[in-house]
């Protein structure tokens, strides 16, 4: 399962490499889902499906507990504007939902180019997940890169990625986790404020100026 799949580059690539696995991917933008669906159809793939849906809603409404083997979230929107923190996907409540939906030993693949989001992820996933080493094939396979990763690399940004394995917990542990887990209230602009002005990339705005 991939949440926020964009144009489907990763999901389609994974479906090609793993024909025995079913792939489900969602995004809130109908335009990119149409493109992703066309991508899969052009390759004749029968093991990947795309849907217009929010990530939390998809996990909540379409899956039973213990039904997902891998959950992939790449470059979730950090929402840099003040007051938008509640829109961030990786809230403690979402992480509990993800933990419940994964099978025993299930894997949560996460990637971001935002240092503050990465720092929050590392703190927030414990004790629900144990971060493990990243597979070499994920690090090096250019065909599996998301569009956002390609753009970030072209801008010289660092890519932070991890695989977190589900830790088996008693149901009662969820309440304790939710009481103590950090809220997703980090400053997404703090690490590289020079890149953004009023929510837009400074570099792009400067290119548009007339000389």
Describe the role of every protein-language-model region.
Residues 36:
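Conserved SAM-binding loop
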Residues 29:
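Conserved SAM/SAH-binding beta-strand->alpha-helix loop
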Residues 105-112:
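Conserved beta-strand signature within the Rossmann-like core of class I S-adenosyl-L-methionine
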């Amino acid at each position: 399962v991939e949440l926020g799949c964009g144009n489907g580059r990763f999901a389609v690539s994974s479906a090609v490499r793993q024909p025995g696995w079913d792939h489900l991917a969602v995004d809130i933008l109908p335009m990119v889902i149409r493109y992703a669906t066309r991508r899969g159809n052009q390759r004749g793939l029968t093991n990947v499906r795309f849907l217009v849906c929010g990530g939390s809603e998809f996990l909540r409404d379409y899956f039973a507990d213990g039904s997902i083997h891998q959950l992939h979230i790449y470059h979730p929107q950090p929402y840099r504007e003040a007051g938008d923190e509640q829109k961030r996907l990786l809230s403690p409540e979402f992480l509990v939902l993800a933990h419940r939906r994964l099978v025993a030993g299930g894997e949560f693949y996460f990637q971001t180019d935002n240092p503050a989001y990465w720092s929050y992820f590392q703190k927030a996933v414990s004790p629900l997940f144990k971060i493990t080493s990243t597979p070499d094939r994920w690090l090096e396979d250019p065909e599996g890169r998301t569009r956002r990763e390609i753009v970030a690399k072209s801008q010289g940004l660092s890519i932070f990625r991890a695989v977190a394995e589900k830790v088996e917990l008693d149901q009662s542990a969820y309440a304790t986790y939710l009481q103590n887990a950090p809220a997703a209230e980090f400053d997404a602009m703090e690490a590289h404020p020079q890149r953004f002005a009023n929510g837009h990339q400074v570099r792009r705005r400067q290119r548009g100026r007339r000389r």
